[in-house]
């Protein structure tokens, strides 16, 4: 635990109270109380963690900023990984081909766009 450093009477010139609080020299053994108003807000507050440019990386994946990619990009990458194969007729994959991502399908259905 870190305590605040209080100047001894020999370090400070006589007649000056360090922070302007009365009674500080009367009880030097008490640690000063920290209040949220006294803490300067500089990128980090008294609550929570500091998330600005927080790096997250593992041995496998070095640090890269997370960026949202389009579904089309992911589909293209996924399709390039394996050998191209034709979908089997009658399976759910065959009927779903070329219809976009699930989120877009759900959004279209909710809008009630019927012809």
UniProtKB/Swiss-Prot annotation:
UniProt entry tagged with the keyword Ligase: no
Region (Disordered): 1-115
Chain intervals with Basic residues compositional bias: 44-79, 102-115
Keyword Nucleus: yes
Any one Gene Ontology cellular component term annotated for this protein: nucleosome
Keyword entries, A-Z: Chromosome, Developmental protein, Differentiation, DNA condensation, DNA-binding, Nucleosome core, Nucleus, Phosphoprotein, Spermatogenesis
Pfam families cross-referenced by the UniProt entry: Protamine_P2
UniProt cross-references to InterPro entries, sorted A to Z: PRM2 (IPR000492)
Example of a GO biological process term: nucleus organization
UniProt subcellular location: Nucleus; Chromosome
Coiled-coil regions, chain positions: none
Tissue localization of expression: Testis.
Compositionally skewed regions (Basic and acidic residues) per UniProt: 24-38
Subunit structure: Interacts with TDRP.
Family in the record: Belongs to the protamine P2 family.
Protein name stated in the entry: Protamine-2
Organism: Bos taurus (Bovine)
């Amino acid at each position: 635990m870190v305590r605040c450093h209080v100047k001894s009477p020999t370090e400070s010139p006589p007649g000056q109270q360090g922070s302007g609080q009365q009674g500080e020299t009367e009880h030097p053994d008490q640690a000063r109380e920290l209040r949220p108003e006294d803490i300067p807000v500089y990128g980090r507050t008294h609550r929570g963690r500091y998330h600005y440019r927080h790096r997250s990386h593992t041995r496998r994946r070095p640090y890269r900023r997370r960026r949202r990619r389009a579904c089309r990009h992911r589909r293209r990458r996924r399709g390039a990984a394996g050998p191209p194969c034709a979908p089997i007729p009658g399976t759910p994959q065959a009927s779903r081909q070329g219809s976009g991502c699930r989120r877009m399908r759900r959004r279209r259905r909710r809008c009630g766009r019927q012809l």
